From Swiss-Prot:
Name this protein carries in UniProt: SsrA-binding protein
Biological source species: Psychrobacter sp. (strain PRwf-1)
Cysteines engaged in disulfide bonds, as pairs: none
Domain of life: Bacteria
Family listed: Belongs to the SmpB family.
Keywords, in A-Z order: Cytoplasm, RNA-binding
Taxonomic lineage: Bacteria, Pseudomonadati, Pseudomonadota, Gammaproteobacteria, Moraxellales
Main location: cytoplasm
């Protein structure tokens, strides 16, 4: 029987810090408006969104603080700006929902991951509420407890 080949991951960049710092209430999928050199750099895996966040200006949403390191070979005729503000493509209803929650209810809008969907670059955005220090400690304590519990079951079965 032939071995199954692993399907390559579509994920480009992930914001692991966001799940530690925030409670994620809802997620939305948004498209990214990119330039040609940015797409080539993303294909080479040169993107980071750990310090990125979503900003609303007018009736549009923008990804601010995402870093794309330019390739030397692809951006020779353009002056690349690696921390450029990039427009997010969302429906009007989604923008209104996110904008209302961020302005009134004290929520934040953070990018969770960037990934390929067919040949398009998509960004998963989370509507998030900030965690307090004791919430972060509780999350770590619960994670450790689950790990110890699994270890105990494994030793008990052996």
């Amino acid at each position: 029987m032939a071995k199954k080949t692993k399907k390559p991951s579509n994920q480009i960049a992930a914001n692991k810090k966001a799940r530690h710092e925030y409670f994620i209430e809802e997620t939305y999928e948004a498209g990214l408006v990119l330039q040609g050199w940015e797409v080539k750099a993303i294909r080479a895996g040169k993107m980071s969104i750990t310090e990125a966040y979503v900003v609303f200006r007018g009736n549009e949403a923008f990804l601010f603080g995402a870093h794309i390191q330019p390739l030397l070979s692809s951006s020779t005729h353009v002056d690349p700006d690696s921390i450029r503000t990039r427009k997010l493509l969302l429906n009007r209803k989604e923008i209104d929902t996110l904008f209302g929650a961020v302005n009134q209810k004290g929520y934040a809008c953070v990018p969770l991951e960037v990934y390929w969907k067919d040949s398009l670059v998509k960004c998963k955005i989370g509507l998030a509420k900030g965690k307090k220090l004791h919430d972060k400690r509780k999350t770590l304590k619960d994670r450790d407890w689950e790990r110890d519990k699994e270890r105990g079951f494994k030793q008990h079965l052996d």
